[in-house]
């Protein structure tokens, strides 16, 4: 009996097979009973359902290829813009910002790639196994990023991809009644193999290096009662066509990883994006609605378009034949797909399907949030885009920054989402005194804030030398907040009283850390690499908004202390408890001194208090008004923050303010004044 069992599984001999041996092979272990031979499969014609599946796969691949080409074009355009904006020669001046280098200027480093000299602010120190530090300028760093994120590092250039032509459908499918369920339909490969839905990495790794997908798509999986032992990549792509828009949303959760680019020859880039764009829906998904009568061109599908990802404002209603679909509009830059700087986005050759496809239906409103939270094709490195606007109100010395929204932010939490907020700083001299932030929005990668943050006391001089840094961070309740990305804008490029809108990509810049207390005597909480800014030989301590008016009706001077901004931090917590002290000199006794209320733990206090001095107009010209700002401390002397003096002996804006007050009676005149670390008396 044992011999019988063993002989049952023995291979046939090398000699000629007898007729009965061939019959046993057809019914034994070599061929599954009821299976069709390859010859029988090739003689059969594909059904219309199978042709539709194939055509939809081709159409989706065309669309994803177009999206990939547009994405690469945007990366190259960004790189070219950085190259055009160079301001130095790379020898004596920084190649990027044009700052003087050498002993009298900033410290310089040499870029490892281009061998140009850059300052330490425009250079980035990269991690390397070398014993000495390796520096790269931001242009070369961006070029490496483009080379990495486009896949050109593997292909030594951008591959030109030509997809197969769609198959013509000879006959149309009869339309089923509305009440009749969609039964007896051709089962999809996904339903035939519910337990064989490989991950994205498995789909790419199963194909040997250099192997291309087979051109014969007629051998769709599952034509017999059982499929082949392993699924080819072409079959895996075709098995993903039956999912609807809901399957797209739920199939792209936070667990989606990086887009791997396996060495698959010229088709590797397309295969990775096709697999990512068409992940299979779960086997428990409900069957789609009954199909409509088929036209000469296959339907455009019912699923929603991919999420906006890195660049927002992409249309979801344009048909696949539209050359701008799915085009992402970035107002800050012009889209280009031509050859630039050695990189070229390969032109796309559309098949007949693109011209015969009907218009795509807009996705349902309830799916927009899930679509927006889905990944794009370079999800491993994208940081997202930020939309905001800037307005400088010159009359009120007010800079308004309206944070509108962000799209496609990098997921920071374990659920694939983030808790983003935006914070602003003015450079140089970033500190808590000029930090503004929005509220935090929970569990979203596409937050909409619509918040306006205002900087008061921004003069024309500040607009010429300040830079606005806008950072997007993820709030963490149980740890440190995480940095997502940032962008910077030089305020001298902003025209007064003209709102300017921006929609730009966030940059991968490490945020500056606070370096403890650089001035322990003053408790200044400054950021690393940000030195204390000085105007001439006078250290910047903040600004104060003062109003002056001589009232003829009351017969005296009315001094208004409105607010202070960007005060120096005097306490260990990085804040101050400021109040303002007024003194009309020469001494007029106790009635010459006034104090405001104390504002706790703030560097931008708002007082809105007025004080009256009973003095004749003729005597006012001989007086001077001493204004000082103090930090209130309990149990010890108050700390002096800064001050200014208005009067005939003053200079510049201070003298002008005092003169206008004397000249224009009964008229309130407001002016911003810089606080200085001048000689002062102790506060009482």
From Swiss-Prot:
Xref: InterPro entries: C2_dom, C2_domain_sf, FYVE_2, FYVE_RPH3A, Rab_BD, Rabphilin/DOC2/Noc2, Rabphilin_Doc2_C2A, Synaptotagmin
Biased composition (Basic and acidic residues): 199-208, 243-252
Residues that, per the record, bind Ca(2+) 3: 529, 571, 577, 631-633
Region (Disordered) residue spans: 1-21, 162-377
GO molecular function, one term: phosphatidylinositol-4,5-bisphosphate binding
Chain intervals annotated as zinc finger (FYVE-type): 88-145
PTM text: Ubiquitinated. Deubiquitinated by CAND1 to prevent its degradation.
Positions that bind Ca(2+) 4: 571, 631, 633, 639
GO cellular component, one term: secretory granule
Role description: Plays an essential role in docking and fusion steps of regulated exocytosis. At the presynaptic level, RPH3A is recruited by RAB3A to the synaptic vesicle membrane in a GTP-dependent manner where it modulates synaptic vesicle trafficking and calcium-triggered neurotransmitter release. In the post-synaptic compartment, forms a ternary complex with GRIN2A and DLG4 and regulates NMDA receptor stability. Also plays a role in the exocytosis of arginine vasopressin hormone.
Subunit structure, interactors included: Interacts with RAB3B, RAB3C, RAB3D, RAB8A, RAB27A and RAB27B. Interacts with RAB3A; this interaction recruits RPH3A to synaptic vesicules. Interacts (via C2B domain) with SNAP25. Interacts with deubiquitinating enzyme CAND1; this interaction results in the deubiquitination of RPH3A. Interacts with GRIN2A and DLG4; this ternary complex regulates NMDA receptor composition at postsynaptic membranes. Interacts with SNCA.
Name of the protein in question: Rabphilin-3A
The organism's taxonomic lineage, starting at the top: Eukaryota, Metazoa, Chordata, Craniata, Vertebrata
Gene responsible for this protein: Rph3a
């Amino acid at each position: 009996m044992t011999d019988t069992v063993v002989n049952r599984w023995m291979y046939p001999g090398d000699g000629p097979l007898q007729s009965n041996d061939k019959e046993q092979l057809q019914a034994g272990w070599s061929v599954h009973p009821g299976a069709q031979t390859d010859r029988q499969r090739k003689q059969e014609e594909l059904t219309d359902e199978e042709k539709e599946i194939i055509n939809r796969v081709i159409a989706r691949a065309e669309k994803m290829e177009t999206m990939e080409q547009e994405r690469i074009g945007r990366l190259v355009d960004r790189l070219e813009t950085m190259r055009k904006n160079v301001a130095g020669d790379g020898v004596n001046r920084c190649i990027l910002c044009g700052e003087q280098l050498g002993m009298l200027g900033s410290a310089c480093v040499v870029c490892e790639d281009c061998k140009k000299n850059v300052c330490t602010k425009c250079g980035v120190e990269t991690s390397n196994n070398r014993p000495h530090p390796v520096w790269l300028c931001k242009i070369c760093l961006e070029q490496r990023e483009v080379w990495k994120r486009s896949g050109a590092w593997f292909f030594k250039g951008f591959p030109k991809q030509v997809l197969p032509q769609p198959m013509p459908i000879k006959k149309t499918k009869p339309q089923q009644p509305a009440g009749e369920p969609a039964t007896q339909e051709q089962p999809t490969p996904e339903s035939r193999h519910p337990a064989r839905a490989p991950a994205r990495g498995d789909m790419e790794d199963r194909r040997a290096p250099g192997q291309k997908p087979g051109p014969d798509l007629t051998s769709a999986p599952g034509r017999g009662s059982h499929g082949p032992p392993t699924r080819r990549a072409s079959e895996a792509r075709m098995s993903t066509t039956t999912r609807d828009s809901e399957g797209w949303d739920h199939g792209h959760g936070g667990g989606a990883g990086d887009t791997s680019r396996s060495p698959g020859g010229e088709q590797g880039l397309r295969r990775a994006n096709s697999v990512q764009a068409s992940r299979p829906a779960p086997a428990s998904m409900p069957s789609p609605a009954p199909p409509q009568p088929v036209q000469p061109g296959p339907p455009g599908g019912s699923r929603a378009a991919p999420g906006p990802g890195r660049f927002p404002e992409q249309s979801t209603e344009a048909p696949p034949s539209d050359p701008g679909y799915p085009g992402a509009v970035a107002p800050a830059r012009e889209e280009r797909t031509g050859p630039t700087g050695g990189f070229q986005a390969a032109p796309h050759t559309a098949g007949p399907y693109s011209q015969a496809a009907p218009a795509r239906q807009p996705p349902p409103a309830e799916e927009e949030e899930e679509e927006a939270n889905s990944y794009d094709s370079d999800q491993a490195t994208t940081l997202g885009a930020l939309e905001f606007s800037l307005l400088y109100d010159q009359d009120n010395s007010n800079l308004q920054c309206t944070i509108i929204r962000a799209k496609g932010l990098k997921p920071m939490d374990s659920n694939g989402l983030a808790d983003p907020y935006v914070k602003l700083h003015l450079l140089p001299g970033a500190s808590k005194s000029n930090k503004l932030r929005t509220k935090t929005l929970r569990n979203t990668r596409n937050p909409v804030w619509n918040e306006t943050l205002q900087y008061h006391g921004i003069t024309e001089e500040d607009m010429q030398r300040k830079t606005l840094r806008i950072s997007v961070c993820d709030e963490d309740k149980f740890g440190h907040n995480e940095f997502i990305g940032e962008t910077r804008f030089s305020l001298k490029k902003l025209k007064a009283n003209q709102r300017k809108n921006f929609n730009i990509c966030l940059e991968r810049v490490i945020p500056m850390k606070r370096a403890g207390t650089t001035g322990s005597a003053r408790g200044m909480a400054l950021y690393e690499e940000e030195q204390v800014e000085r105007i001439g030989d006078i250290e910047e301590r903040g600004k104060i908004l003062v109003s002056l008016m001589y009232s003829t009706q009351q017969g005296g001077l009315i001094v208004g202390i409105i607010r202070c901004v960007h005060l120096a931090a005097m306490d260990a917590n990085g804040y101050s408890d400021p109040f303002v002290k007024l003194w009309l000199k020469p001494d007029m006794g106790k009635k010459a001194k006034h104090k405001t209320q104390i504002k706790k733990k703030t560097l931008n206090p708002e007082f809105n208090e007025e004080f009256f001095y009973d003095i004749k107009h003729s005597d006012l010209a001989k007086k001077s008004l001493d204004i000082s700002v103090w930090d209130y401390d309990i149990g010890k002397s108050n700390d002096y923050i800064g001050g200014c003096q208005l009067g005939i002996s003053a200079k510049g804006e201070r003298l002008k303010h005092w003169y206008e007050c004397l000249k224009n009676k009964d008229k309130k005149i407001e002016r911003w004044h810089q606080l200085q670390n001048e000689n002062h008396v102790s506060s009482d």
